[in-house]
Structures are given as C-alpha cells and as structure tokens.
Amino acid sequence: MDINKMTYAVQSALQQAVELSQQHKLQNIEIEAILSAALNESESLYKSILERANIEVDQLNKAYEDKLNTYASVEGDNIQYGQYISQQANQLITKAESYMKEYEDEYISMEHILRSAMDIDQTTKHYINNKVEVIKEIIKKVRGGNHVTSQNPEVNYEALAKYGRDLVEEVRQGKMDPVIGRDEEIRNTIRILSRKTKNNPVLIGEPGVGKTAIVEGLAQRIVKKDVPESLLDKTVFELDLSALVAGAKYRGEFEERLKAVLKEVKESDGRIILFIDEIHMLVGAGKTDGAMDAGNMLKPMLARGELHCIGATTLNEYREYIEKDSALERRFQKVAVSEPDVEDTISILRGLKERYEVYHGVRIQDRALVAAAELSDRYITDRFLPDKAIDLVDQACATIRTEMGSNPTELDQVNRRVMQLEIEESALKNESDNASKQRLQELQEELANEKEKQAALQSRVESEKEKIANLQEKRAQLDESRQALEDAQTNNNLEKAAELQYGTIPQLEKELRELEDNFQDEQGEDTDRMIREVVTDEEIGDIVSQWTGIPVSKLVETEREKLLHLSDILHKRVVGQDKAVDLVSDAVVRARAGIKDPNRPIGSFLFLGPTGVGKTELAKSLAASLFDSEKHMIRIDMSEYMEKHAVSRLIGAPPGYIGHDEGGQLTEAVRRNPYSVILLDEVEKAHTDVFNVLLQILDEGRLTDSKGRSVDFKNTIIIMTSNIGSQVLLENVKETGEITESTEKAVMTSLNAYFKPEILNRMDDIVLFKPLSIDDMSMIVDKILTQLNIRLLEQRISIEVSDDAKAWLGQEAYEPQYGARPLKRFVQRQIETPLARMMIKEGFPEGTTIKVNLNSDNNLTFNVEKIHE
C-alpha cells in the first residue's frame, strides 16, 4: 500500500481512521474506521455522492460506529493502537487500486474507495441496497470525464457549481429582485454576446449604478424567453473569484481550479455564459513567481470565442488594471453604464416596492419612494443612484420593522410604572404604621388603574399586531402566486397560468384590499395607531439626516420656534451688529424652508470691520445656535496660508507629494460634516491666489479635491472675516453708529484694491461691522459677567456687580479701535484677579454671594454679602 499514490482526501481519511482505532482501543485499522472517516471528512466527496443518491448518511455513519464497537478492545501497557491494517481494510484498498486502473487514474481517490466499499463491506451494501447503478451514474457525472492526475482532484469536480452560482436558476426559484429599465444596456450586451468572436461584453460604470443588475436582467429575460433564439438555451453563471482563490494551499492549485471551471464552460459548447463581477481582480490573481495569472489564462479562450464572458468593473479600476493589459482589453467590448436620473430611479423603486414590502412586512407610500430618489440625489453626493436611493428605502423599512417588533413607547412607560408600583407595594406590605397603610391603600388604587390601562393598551397592541400579521401573510401569498404565474407562463403551462391569473391572484388582491380597508377603518389614521407599519417620506428624511447631518426632515415645533427667533438668539451673543445678524439668520431660514438656490451654498458673507467688534463671534454663535455646539464650525485661520503653495493644504497635496492620502483640511472637514458653518478668519492675511479656489465654492457650491472627488458645499454657510477698511470705518463713523454712504464707498475701494472682482461678485453680501459704542460696551460687560458667573457656579459661588460698577468698567475699557477685547482684559484685571486672590486667601464656603460696588475714589470694592445655609 503506497500512501503517495493516494489523494490528499484519502490520506486524511486514513489518518482519521488511525485516530478512531485509538479511541476504540483497537490494534487493527478496521474497514469501518476508514469508511466512517471518509464519511466525516470536510467537503467529503464520499458523503456528497451518497446524499445525492438519497441514502441516509447519518444512519450509515451510526452503523459504522456500531460495527466498530463490536470489535474486541485491547487494554494494557505499551500497546500501540491502530498500527496494523486489518485484512478486510487491506482488501478495500486493493480493490480501490484496481478501480483506479479501470478509470485510468494516477491516484486512489474517494470515488474508488466508495466503489470498493460497495463491493466488499456488508454494512455499505445493506444501506446502498439496489442503488448501485444510480451511484455509478452520479460518480460519472461528478467526474465529468476528468481523470485523477493530481492529489487534489476534487477541485476539478463540478467546479462551476462549487465556485459559481447559476443566476438563471435563481431567477426560476424567485430569489432575485426584478430589474426595472436598463433596456438599452441589456440589448447592447445581447448584441455583443451574439457575435462569433470577441463576444465578451464588459460593463463599465460607477459603483452602485446597476452593472450587476444588467446581468440579472439578462438572466430574467432568458427565463422569460425574451431573448434572441441564439441565447434561449443559455445559462448565466456568476464566478466567485474569492472562493476560487480561498484555500488554494499548494502551488498551481488556483490554476487547476480555474482550468477546471474553464473546461466546464468550454465543454458546454457555448451554453454557459460566465459572469465575472469585479473583473479587474483577474489581472494578477494567482500570480506567484513564474506562475501565470488568471487574466492570461483567459485570453486564448476569449479570443477564439470559446468562452462567453461578461465582466463588470468600475471606471477607475478598468483604467488601472484592464487598460494596462491591452491584449486583455481588446478581447472585451465595452458597455457604458451611466447613472440613472431621478425619474428613472423612482421607476426602479416602484418596481422593487412590493419585494421590500413583503420582506419587511411594512407598507411603503409612493411619496416615500419619490423622497428617497430626490433627497439621495440632492444630499448624498459621494454615492450613485439607484443604489443610494434603494439603501434609503431599505433602511427606512428596517427602522419601521424594528419598531413594530418592540413595544410602543406608551405601553412601555405603563409597564415600567406598573413594575415600579409593584415593587413599592411589596415594600409597604411589611410596614405596620398607619401612614404606610394609608400610602399602601392609595398605591393599590393607583396600581389597579395602571393595570387596567396596561391591559387595555396591551389588548390594542396585540389586536394591531394580529391585523398587521394577517396583512403580511396575504402580501406574501400574493407574491408567491405572482412568482408561480411567471413560472407557469415560462413553462407554457397555460391551464395553471390561467387559473392563477384569472382566479387566485384577483381573489388574493381583493382579500388584501378588504383587510387594508378594515384595518384603516378600525384603527383610524396612521397617527392614531399604536404600531406604525407605514414608511413615509418623513422616515426617509430622518435617515438622510442621520447619514449626512443635514436637517431635511419636516420641521418639528421646537425647531420652528428656534428658527423664527434665530436673530434674537444671535443678538444675545453679538452686540450692536443688527444688519449682520439679520442677513445671516435670513439665509438660514431660507435654506431650512427649502427655497434657497439648491446649487449654491446656504449663504456666503464677507464681514468687514475693526478688530473685536463680533465678526468671529457671530460665526461661533451661529454654529452654536444651529448645532448646539461651536465644534460644528470649520475654522480655517487664513494667516496660515500666506504662501502661494499653501492652497494645497485646503484641497490636499497633489499626487506624488507627501500627504496626498490625507486629503485637504477644508475638503475633508466638509466631506465629514456637509452641514456646517465655515469660518475663513482674517482672509486678507492669505496669499491672493488662495482665493481662486473659492470661486467654484461660492458660485456652484462644489470643490474638487486633489483626488478628483467632488466635495459638496451646498449645505454650508461660508463666512469670511477681514480688517480691510477698518481704519476708514473708525475715522468716519457717525456718533449714532451709522455708516455713511461715503464711508461705505471708501471701504469698498480698499476692498477692490485687494480682492479680484470675480470673488466679490460671487458673495451673497459684504457686511460692514460698525465700531462699538459706549452703550454696546455696557451690554458686553453684562455678557462677560454672566460667563464669569457660569464658571463660578461650579464652586457654588456667585458674584453681583452694581450698575455703577458696570458703567465704570465699560467707560474705562472703551477703545473704539480695539473693540471688546480690551474690556475682557480689563474685567480680568479689575474683577477676576482680586476675586481669585480672595478665594485662595479666605476660601469661601458654598452658597457665598460676592457683591462688587464702585466707591467714591472710582475703585471697586468686594463684599461677602450673604451665605446660604
């Protein structure tokens, strides 16, 4: 017995047989041990052949085990188990060797062991009974005319079934979603497949536009016989490249598997069309030192027309992999797959609607499909239709399905209240005082009411769930009947088709309508129901908001109030700049109402004015008002962009330079947060060429980064701040704080000298910030002191400053050319520093209030006024 003349599977079975003999304490390796091991091998050919012959494999395995248990086990020291092969087991191998010669093979394989067992082993004979000829036929079919010329022949058996999936068969079984549209691309593919040579289309398009769907559409047309006569008998197999490569341990094993697949395709005489998704993976697949890659193995068959192949890949990967190999490229014919428009996407969604309704058990409104197509097109800019719209609908359905599976909020709250009262009741039962008894009586009354409420709600929820389950069941029956109708029409079973089309399906549709009408009448409007089972445009809007951070869902009352009073909220933080605040808040209101220009940013403003008057503060307060956090503001300090080449930091370093993979500071920030406030601070400090990059942002709301990706700025507010013309403003502003027309012209002249006209012309508004007046200073003092009190609150201390002291602080710190910043420093020196010294020296207890007054010498006095007990 030469173990080197056996395949790896047989060698492994013999090794397992030795281990079985050791477990049963047998000195000899019995025939049952070998056959049991062969049956339990992973991916066992022995087992798979018997299963296909409808033999009870589990019972056969138990019979082998029972037979092994009848052999006498040997106990003792230094006994070596499984060292010798029994006479019957030896006969098994000898007979298998004779079958190897009969089949003209080079190695003993699993099918030889099976044939040998059918002749020699009584247990196997008993279970196989009269199926010997059936098994011989299955072995012949599995081998497919191949000879065992390697130690791993199983990879060559039924290679297509192992490494691919039959799309036509999946269509027949109703496992595939319908393909809507794409008629021109499918026709193009059919034309190319009908050629004599080079009949290999490759579908090229962006990810998510429906390349795979075109092949699925072709498979569906083949089933419906809606193809030219030359394609009627064809079947489409999708090749799984990852399965082909996975587990190829030995050199040449990958090539052997691929050759087996190609041999099956070739021997089908053109009946099999091979579909390879991500076909660029073929280039270089399986390439090791001196080995041939998969792409080169395909070329001869592709050129001769022996292999019908459909490829699919993206534009970038086609350019990167396929175009480099011109010999491979010329063997394929390109079919461009463009992104469908919104109208086509809505049609696709309407076609898929029923499938998603049946799968999720929900009802999808048509306006939800329209919203999915429109909102995904407008807001999800880094992906492609129809994929992103289908994803939105699927996610919204899953959200509603999850809600349907759990208790409604109202019932959940009652359940928790009942549980809380029951715990309280059990605690009070142990008390004997009158107060506890009184409380127990009150509590039991409340508990009885809550339980009654709970029972009513539970009954209502279960009633709704039952009705929804009936609706789901009826929809599933209707879907199955429609699938059965398609099968009957395809198989020309006209009697069954007529029965389904004119009897079963209309009856099911009528029953479904009645169920829906009853449900509607009993439960009232959707809003009155405990359980939602309808997907509306609101759910779609919520999902878009979750994915992008852009608020596209309907305005709730709290947000409505917030938007209407946005200017008031901003005025509280930004003092004395009414025009600027109103312009910015108006832009936000227009955007949220949905009437802004959809192809431009929400607003783009240039704030001009002296330092410290609130230009940056307005941008910060806007971010805080819209997003409840200043962190959502993208702040770019333009003083860092003084050199001409610094523009690459905004959009990313060009290819070949360090940092190319990291992306740009501006583009990456906006890609992550498409709905944000962008503050370009101190723009006049930057190099003038840096502004050229802003032209596309301000005009069309987009910017292309260094990797060629288009970044969407349509949902951003762009605020630029500058000190240009601040000297003119300081010198010429009226005492009332108004800016004269001549002053405005002088500032614009300074501005035109610095900025190019095309930049200024693209901005929504140029806002002049007036210098702060004395009145403004007193309001800013209040604001600074409020912030100080918030910080002191952590230590349970508060400070109260008299009106005289506030007025004095405002007057003393008033410097028009420097704005509010000197006031901050002055408050630090006059109040914060003395207060800090007092706190460290005296250590105020919690609840202390410190009163600050102005004395006759114009000095501030600090008094510890009261202590709360």
UniProtKB/Swiss-Prot annotation:
UniProt-annotated binding residues for ATP 1: 205-212
Domain notes: The Clp repeat (R) domain probably functions as a substrate-discriminating domain, recruiting aggregated proteins to the ClpB hexamer and/or stabilizing bound proteins. The NBD2 domain is responsible for oligomerization, whereas the NBD1 domain stabilizes the hexamer probably in an ATP-dependent manner. The movement of the coiled-coil domain is essential for ClpB ability to rescue proteins from an aggregated state, probably by pulling apart large aggregated proteins, which are bound between the coiled-coils motifs of adjacent ClpB subunits in the functional hexamer.
Region described as Linker: 340-549
Species of the source: Staphylococcus aureus (strain COL)
Family the UniProt entry places it in: Belongs to the ClpA/ClpB family.
SMART domains (UniProt xref): AAA, ClpB_D2-small
Name of the protein: Chaperone protein ClpB
Residue ranges, annotated region (Repeat 2): 85-145
InterPro entries: AAA+_ATPase, ATPase_AAA_core, Chaperonin_ClpB, Clp_ATPase_C, Clp_N_dom_sf, Clp_R_dom, ClpA/B, ClpA/B_CS1
Gene3D superfamilies found in the cross-reference section: 1.10.8.60, Clp, N-terminal domain, P-loop containing nucleotide triphosphate hydrolases
GO biological process per UniProt: cellular response to heat; protein refolding
Coiled-coil annotated residue ranges, if any: 390-524
Keyword ATP-binding on entry: yes
Domain Clp R, residue spans: 3-145
Assembly and binders: Homohexamer. The oligomerization is ATP-dependent.
Localization: Cytoplasm
Record region (NBD1): 158-339
